[in-house]
């Protein structure tokens, strides 16, 4: 039986997955991890993990508002992340 990953190890793995090669996306995802991840409910965490699986070019267009995200849950979290102060 696999052990559940402790929160610190999970955060380190997520931080690595948040490295997108685009500074702006790195900062947006990092901001979420630093400010919201620890208190986020499981459903919101699942949505964030879905975002991490998306392609960078799509994420860029969604975060910059050039294109609407087709998934309502993802779009809501993107809006929340964009609204976080720098």
From Swiss-Prot:
Any Pfam family matching the protein: Sdh5
GO BP, sorted A to Z: succinate metabolic process
Chief localisation class: cytoplasm
Taxonomy, superkingdom: Bacteria
Localization annotation: Cytoplasm
Keywords tagged on the record: Chaperone, Cytoplasm
GO cellular component: cytoplasm
SUPFAM superfamilies on file: YgfY-like (SSF109910)
Record has Glycosyltransferase as a keyword: no
Keyword Cytoplasm: yes
Family stated for the protein in its record: Belongs to the SdhE FAD assembly factor family.
Function as written in the Swiss-Prot or TrEMBL entry: An FAD assembly protein, which accelerates covalent attachment of the cofactor into other proteins. Plays an essential role in the assembly of succinate dehydrogenase (SDH, respiratory complex II), an enzyme complex that is a component of both the tricarboxylic acid cycle and the electron transport chain, and which couples the oxidation of succinate to fumarate with the reduction of ubiquinone (coenzyme Q) to ubiquinol. Required for flavinylation (covalent attachment of FAD) of the flavoprotein subunit SdhA of SDH and other flavinylated proteins as well.
Name of the protein in question: FAD assembly factor SdhE
Taxonomic lineage of the native organism: Bacteria, Pseudomonadati, Pseudomonadota, Gammaproteobacteria, Lysobacterales
Underlying gene: sdhE
